[in-house]
Regions:
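N-terminal Rossmann-like or analogous alpha/beta NTP/dinucleotide-binding catalytic cores
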Residues: 1-109
Length: 109
C-alpha cells in the first residue's frame, strides 16, 4: 500500500459474552492477515466492559478459536483493565469540549 505511513496495527475486538462464530473468524483472519502482509501487528482487545455478560468460558473460547485459526496476536489487551485510562481521556475530551455527557434516560434514547 503506497499510502500507508508508519506501522500498520490492526485489532480484533471480541466481547467475551458469547461463543465466537464464523463472522468473528472472518474478521480475525482479515485483520491478522492484513497486518502480516504489511509487516504490522495485530492486537487482541477483549472488550469485556459488560461484567453481567462476560464469562471465563467465553474468554477461553476466543483463545481456542485463535489457536485453531493459527492466529497469534502481538499483544492481548483486556479492556476492563484499562478503565482508568479510558476515563482519563474521556475527561480530557469533555474538558476540551470535544465530547459531552448525555443525561437522557433509556426511554428517550
Amino acid at each position: 500500500m503506497r499510502n500507508v505511513k508508519g506501522k500498520v496495527v490492526t485489532r480484533i475486538p471480541p466481547e467475551p459474552s458469547k461463543y465466537p462464530h464464523i463472522g468473528h473468524a472472518v474478521s480475525f483472519l482479515i485483520n491478522y492477515m492484513y497486518a502480516q502482509k504489511y509487516g504490522g501487528d495485530c492486537v487482541l482487545r477483549l472488550d469485556d466492559t459488560n461484567p453481567e455478560k462476560v464469562k471465563k468460558e467465553y474468554y477461553d473460547a476466543v483463545h481456542e478459536g485463535l489457536l485453531w485459526l493459527n492466529i497469534a496476536p502481538k499483544k492481548i489487551m483486556i479492556a476492563s483493565n484499562e478503565m482508568e485510562t479510558f476515563y482519563k481521556y474521556a475527561k480530557k475530551l469533555i474538558e476540551e469540549e470535544n465530547a459531552f455527557v448525555c443525561f437522557w434516560d433509556r426511554e428517550k434514547m
